[in-house]
C-alpha cells in the first residue's frame, strides 16, 4: 500500500478541522489516521473501534467531523447514528464505509438518519493517495461549511405573500434527506399541488430516493421523465445528471429534462428548476431551499421572487450545512426561515390551488 502523502494546505478557518474516526477495522483505522495526520489543516482527536467508545470520547473532546463506518459488530454505525449526532454537538458525520460501494439503500438510510455525506471506502489495499485526496476534500468542505455557518451574517426577511400555491419546488443537498423527511412528515395530505424536488445525489441513487420519499411523504414520488405530466399531490424528482425543468401545456405542468451547464456545476441543479417554475407558476410559485453546501438555488430563488413568488429557507439551527439556505437568506430573497416542519406548516396554511 502506498504511504499517504503529506498534503500542504492553506488553512481557511484559522484552526485545524478536528476529526474522530470510528471503524472496527484496525487496518482501516491506522490507514485513515495516517491520512488525517498527513494534512496540515486537519487534526485527529481520536480513532476508536466502535460507537460506544466514540460517545465516551465525545464527552471529553469536541470535533468538527466524524468519520463513521456503517458495518460494525454489535452496535452498527447506522443504528448508532442518532446518538452520535447528539453526542457530537453539531459535528458533521461523514460515512466512510464499504457499504456505500454496493448500492443506494444503506447510503440513503444513513443520509436520512442525519449523516452529512457519504464516501465509499475502498478495500484495504486501495486506501491510497487518490482516496486520501477525495477524503480530505470531503472533510475540509464539511468542516469549512460548519465554521462558515457559525460566522454567517444577519439577514432580513421579505414580506410573505398569502396567495395559494400552484407549484411547490424544493431544493436540497448535504443533509437534505433528513430535512425532507421532517418536512413531508409535517405536510398534510390535504396539500394537493404538484411538488418538484432537486436533491444532489448520484443518478443511480434516484430511484431508491424516490421510493424513500414516497414512504416519508405518504404520497407517490417518481423520477422525472421527459414529457410526463406533473400531477397534483405527487412528487417529481430530478433524475440527475439532467436537471428537472417544468413547462406548461394548457392547464398541465409538464416535466422536461435538460443537460444545460450551470454556474454552480451541480448536476442536477436547483437553479434551472426554480427558473422554470418561476416562469410557469409566477406569483403562485413557492420555492423551499433546504440544507446544503454551496449556493445552488440562489439564482433560481431570485427568479421566483422576480415573478412574484415566494422563497422559504431552512433555518441555520436545524440545517446540517447552512450554505444553500444561508446564501438565499443573505441575498434578501427569503420570506420565512424555519425548521422543516415549520416550513411545512407555512405551506399548509397557504394551501393549494
Where are these regions (language model features)?
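Conserved acid/base catalytic micro-environments in cytosolic active-site loops
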Residues: 1-21, 25-41, 47, 51-55, ...
Amino acid at each position: 500500500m502506498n504511504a499517504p502523502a503529506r498534503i500542504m494546505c492553506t488553512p481557511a478557518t484559522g484552526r485545524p478541522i478536528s476529526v474522530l474516526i470510528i471503524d472496527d477495522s484496525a487496518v482501516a483505522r491506522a490507514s485513515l489516521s495516517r491520512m488525517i495526520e498527513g494534512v496540515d489543516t486537519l487534526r485527529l482527536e481520536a480513532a476508536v473501534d466502535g460507537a460506544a467508545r466514540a460517545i465516551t470520547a465525545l464527552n471529553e473532546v469536541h470535533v468538527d467531523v466524524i468519520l463513521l463506518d456503517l458495518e460494525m459488530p454489535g452496535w452498527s454505525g447506522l443504528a448508532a447514528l442518532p446518538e452520535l449526532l447528539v453526542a457530537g454537538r453539531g459535528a458533521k458525520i461523514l460515512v466512510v464505509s464499504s457499504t456505500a460501494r454496493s448500492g443506494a439503500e444503506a447510503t440513503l438510510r444513513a443520509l436520512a438518519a442525519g449523516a452529512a455525506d457519504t464516501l465509499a471506502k475502498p478495500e484495504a489495499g486501495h486506501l491510497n493517495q487518490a482516496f486520501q485526496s477525495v477524503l480530505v476534500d470531503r472533510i475540509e468542505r464539511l468542516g469549512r461549511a460548519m465554521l462558515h455557518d457559525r460566522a454567517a451574517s444577519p439577514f432580513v426577511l421579505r414580506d410573505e405573500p398569502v396567495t395559494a400555491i400552484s407549484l411547490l419546488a424544493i431544493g436540497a443537498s448535504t443533509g437534505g434527506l433528513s430535512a425532507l423527511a421532517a418536512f413531508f412528515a409535517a405536510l398534510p395530505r390535504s396539500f394537493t399541488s404538484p411538488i418538484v424536488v432537486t436533491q444532489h445525489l448520484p443518478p443511480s441513487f434516484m430511484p431508491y430516493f424516490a421510493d424513500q420519499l414516497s414512504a416519508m411523504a405518504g404520497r407517490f414520488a417518481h423520477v422525472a421523465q421527459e414529457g410526463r405530466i406533473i400531477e397534483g399531490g405527487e412528487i417529481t424528482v430530478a433524475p440527475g445528471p439532467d436537471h428537472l425543468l417544468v413547462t406548461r401545456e394548457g392547464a398541465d405542468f409538464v416535466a422536461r429534462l435538460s443537460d444545460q451547464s450551470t454556474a454552480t456545476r451541480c448536476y442536477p441543479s436547483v437553479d434551472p428548476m426554480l427558473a422554470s417554475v418561476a416562469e410557469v407558476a409566477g406569483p403562485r410559485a413557492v420555492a423551499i431551499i433546504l440544507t446544503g453546501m454551496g449556493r445552488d438555488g440562489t439564482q433560481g430563488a431570485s427568479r421566483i421572487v422576480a415573478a412574484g413568488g415566494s422563497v422559504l429557507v431552512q433555518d441555520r439551527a436545524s440545517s446540517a450545512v447552512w450554505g444553500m439556505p444561508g446564501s438565499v437568506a443573505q441575498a434578501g430573497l427569503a420570506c420565512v426561515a424555519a425548521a422543516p416542519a415549520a416550513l411545512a406548516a407555512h405551506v399548509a396554511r397557504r394551501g393549494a390551488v
